[in-house]
Amino acid sequence: MNIIEGKLIGQSLKFGITIGRFNEFIGGKLLDGAVDALIRHGVDEKDIEIAWVPGAFEIPLIAKKMAKSKKYDGIICLGAVIRGATTHYDYVASEVSKGIAKITLDEEVPVIFGVLTTENIEQAIERAGTKAGNKGYEAACTAIEMANIINII
């Protein structure tokens, strides 16, 4: 039996990050966590490229362009969609998650979903570096592991 597992070793890997500017006070914390994780696991700062987009809905397009470029071992998608008083949240959260999943399958590049979808601002704050850890950090670790698995297979 051969077991394939990715390692959290980022040396010689290159990552693209696309992040929504809307709810930037949350997204910025996710970005800090992601960059921290990449550097702590050996990714050179010059091998991290960050693209800011207006909001979460725009993330999949830039993630797709990054994936198609074949310059990156993985793409990390960050942002925050917080439920408000209208149904806008439902549409944005659904389309962003579907878009990111489709890119991963179509382009065969790890495209990691690090977009918070929360019921309220408190939940978003908790997941951006307080009680529930930093989901940006976790997304970056997932990207490193997946990039290493892809390189093994």
From Swiss-Prot:
Pfam families: DMRL_synthase
GO terms for cellular component: cytosol; riboflavin synthase complex
Taxonomy, superkingdom: Bacteria
Signal peptide range: none
Catalytic activity: (2S)-2-hydroxy-3-oxobutyl phosphate + 5-amino-6-(D-ribitylamino)uracil = 6,7-dimethyl-8-(1-D-ribityl)lumazine + phosphate + 2 H2O + H(+)
UniProt similarity note: Belongs to the DMRL synthase family.
Name of the protein in its database record: 6,7-dimethyl-8-ribityllumazine synthase
